[in-house]
Amino acid sequence: MWPLSHRHLCLAFLLVCVLSAISFFLHIHQDSFRHGLSLSVLCPDRHLVTPPVAIFCLPGSPMSPNASSPRPQHPASLSGTWTIYPDGRFGNQMGQYATLLALAQLNGRRAFILPSMHAALAPVFRITLPVLAPEVDSRTPWRELRLHDWMSEEYADLGDPFLKLSGFPCSWTFFHHLREQIRSEFTLHDHLRQEAQSVLGRLRLGRSGDRPRTFVGVHVRRGDYLQVMPQRWKGVVGNSAYLRQAMDWFRARHEAPVFVVTSNGMEWCRENIDASKGDVMFAGDGQEASPWKDFALLTQCNHTIMTIGTFGFWAAYLAGGDTVYLANFTLPDSEFLKIFKPEAAFLPEWVGINADLSPLWTLAEP
């Protein structure tokens, strides 16, 4: 065996030092997750109107310097019982579910959902949170907390072992650091996914008869929002001009797209969306009592055009790809802006197209 030279010994020593440093770094890095998330970093300025309440970005969120995704705590290390009051429609309850899951993990608590939320979501998704029995719910000494719709510092340090949340949270600032886990929770059951893919597979471009190369889901929120937005919130819903601009944005960037339109106002869509190019398909059934068919279609598309509402948000969030949304859809003095922060509602990479507010100015005239 050849004797080791002085140079070989030095190289071996340096190698041991490097390996030791790497091992120490990994140990510290893992401990930081084991002992919880750091919330010392505020979201940097996005050059939007600064909200009166600071919005926190958790590590792993789009605007956080730490882009790694934290590991959820093992169930054995969790304690207490947290739940959330299920309120609103399909998209609202998805937001409540995701927020409960994220905040409970962040605070080291066990999360349970109430039976009505399970009844709304379990037929559609492979959700995993256990259901809280009604008799346990009635006997639990709850403290109640109503959430606003963005992540705040106080939500990261809630000491209550028995907490019932409420409100309509649907902001990525609560749960985007757990995005893969959230997407896993909202995985469609196979039969819904297969049915949606079958519908998309039958679509053809009108002029050529070719298969589309790109599927763009379009959700047009109508229904009660036609009255609620202008009368209560000084706001508008997406009109035909907005939808035309959004579609043109995709036509300019993607080859042979097809627009898969769903809405709770399909008749309006057929009358107001220009389908003369042969690339618009009115595929939704518009049944608000059974929204999962339209939702499944949207999530199986490559990209999304949304107007307003949580249904469109979740379709875009789960589909991935490019998202175009209706921006600045209320007057500046709208009370809606006290409970809704656009910078906390829409992911930074999503593309906003400003709404046409002229109908509101017409209403305001004497």
UniProtKB/Swiss-Prot annotation:
Glycans are attached at N66, N302, N328. This is Galactoside alpha-(1,2)-fucosyltransferase 1. Its main location: Golgi. Keywords: Glycoprotein, Glycosyltransferase, Golgi apparatus, Lipid metabolism, Membrane, Signal-anchor, Transferase, Transmembrane, Transmembrane helix. Catalyzes the transfer of L-fucose, from a guanosine diphosphate-beta-L-fucose, to the terminal galactose residue of glycoconjugates through an alpha(1,2) linkage leading to H antigen synthesis that is an intermediate substrate in the synthesis of ABO blood group antigens. H antigen is essential for maturation of the glomerular layer of the main olfactory bulb, in cell migration and early cell-cell contacts during tumor associated angiogenesis. Preferentially fucosylates soluble lactose and to a lesser extent fucosylates glycolipids gangliosides GA1 and GM1a. GO terms for biological process: carbohydrate metabolic process; fucosylation; lipid metabolic process; olfactory bulb development; positive regulation of cell-matrix adhesion; positive regulation of endothelial cell migration; positive regulation of endothelial cell-matrix adhesion via fibronectin; positive regulation of sprouting angiogenesis. Residues 1-8 are cytoplasmic. The chain crosses the membrane at residues 9-25. It is found in: Golgi apparatus, Golgi stack membrane. It comes from the Eukaryota. It is an enzyme of class 2 (transferase). Pathway: Protein modification; protein glycosylation. It catalyses: a beta-D-galactosyl-(1->4)-N-acetyl-beta-D-glucosaminyl derivative + GDP-beta-L-fucose = an alpha-L-Fuc-(1->2)-beta-D-Gal-(1->4)-beta-D-GlcNAc derivative + GDP + H(+); a ganglioside GA1 + GDP-beta-L-fucose = a ganglioside Fuc-GA1 + GDP + H(+); a beta-D-Gal-(1->3)-beta-D-GlcNAc-(1->3)-beta-D-Gal-(1->4)-beta-D-Glc-(1<->1')-Cer(d18:1(4E)) + GDP-beta-L-fucose = alpha-L-fucosyl-(1->2)- beta-D-galactosyl-(1->3)-N-acetyl-beta-D-glucosaminyl-(1->3)-beta-D-galactosyl-(1->4)-beta-D-glucosyl-(1<->1')-N-acylsphing-4-enine + GDP + H(+); a neolactoside nLc4Cer(d18:1(4E)) + GDP-beta-L-fucose = a neolactoside IV(2)-alpha-Fuc-nLc4Cer(d18:1(4E)) + GDP + H(+). The keyword Transferase applies.
